[in-house]
Amino acid sequence: MHAQSEFLSSLQRQSQHAFQRSGVVLQGEADWQEAILSAFLQTQTTQRWFCVGDWSFESAFCVGMKQGNRLLGRECDVLLFDARKEFDANSFTAAIGSLVGGGMLLVMTNTAQPQHFAEQWMQTQWQKLIVLEQGKVIPQVSELAIAQRNTEYIEQTHAVSLIEKVVNGHRKRPLVLTADRGRG
């Protein structure tokens, strides 16, 4: 368990430094997954955790499987998603929007072979992430390229300066702010 927990901590540090989100699938028995999560959670002192599914971590904000939309407008460093019993795409996509740059998505999946076409398709999608499998060697992950943070928010900085100009200006004029995507 220590090796997997250390791997997750190392990947998290690397992701934060590169300002890139990382996705990890833990595929194995529930006891094995929960032991790794408990060990990894103990290393987390300042990270905000959100959980979607049947979780009850004391230091995390947890919601039910179909309640991922409750995470909208919030931010987290680690998002834990339980896909072992069922998968709700709407809940997943709403919850994933809360993951900050440099954050980590942890997905729990079963070791059982998928029965239906939809489950088979989901299984192939999870394989595109970093997969930690019970009883298998920890995968090698290449170094992440460091993103240029200071140029990322030029439009946001400009928008804030325009808002300040309207608030502090002499005329009472309306402000219209639009964004191409949801969180802007």
Residue ranges and their predicted role:
Residues 4-9, 14-43, 49:
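Long, charged/polar, low-complexity intrinsically disordered N-terminal extensions
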Residues 5-12, 52-72:
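A short, well-structured beta->alpha microelement
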Residues 19-24, 170-176:
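Pre-Walker A (Motif I) flank of P-loop NTPase domains
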Residues 25, 50, 78-82, 106, ...:
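Structural motif
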Residues 26, 45-54, 62-64, 105-107, ...:
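Short, hydrophobic beta-strand segments that form beta-sheet elements in well-ordered domains
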Residues 29-32, 177-184:
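Walker A/P-loop nucleotide-binding motif
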Residues 68-141:
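N-terminal accessory nucleic-acid engagement/regulatory domains that precede
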